[in-house]
Amino acid sequence: MNHKKTRLGRYLTIFGLLNIFVISFTVPLLFGEWLMWQPRNTAVEMMISTIYLAMGIVMIRIAQDPLPHKGFIDFLIVANLTHALVMLIYAESLWHILFDASAIALLGGLPLFFYPWGLRQFLRY
């Protein structure tokens, strides 16, 4: 259980930093057209970016002691996997499926590999 807790803490720190510095504002502002689905909707992009920013801040905050925050970690997993599913449904090309949806699904589902409560406890309260 302890090594899973440590790995989960590392994941929360790394993915939290990615959320803050890469996924939130960096991608829409720096890469613009290249990584954005078309047609662009800047208001929606910024709203989604702020959600990822907030999630990143909380992930870093709870990384030191993730076990009391099972509900939030379950939310992260479900939110990212369902986000990837919606991206998969609306993907207009193979490139979007392979790059965007796969990355979100992998990063979002990764905690299930070292889920410290045991997979039988996923979404159980």
Regions found by a protein language model. Give the residues of each.
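Core segments of alpha-helical transmembrane spans in multipass integral membrane proteins
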Residues: 17-25, 42-63, 75-85
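A loop-to-helix transmembrane entry motif
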Residues: 10-15, 35-52, 100
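Membrane-water interface at the C-terminal end of transmembrane alpha helices
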Residues: 105-125
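Hydrophobic alpha-helical membrane segments
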Residues: 71-88, 105-110
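Cytosolic juxtamembrane helix and N-cap/initiation of the first transmembrane helix
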Residues: 1-18
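Short, hydrophobic transmembrane alpha-helix segments
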Residues: 32-38, 61-65
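Membrane-helix boundary connector in multi-pass membrane proteins
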Residues: 63, 85-102, 117-121
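Juxtamembrane membrane-water interface segments of multi-pass membrane proteins
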Residues: 1-5, 59-71, 125
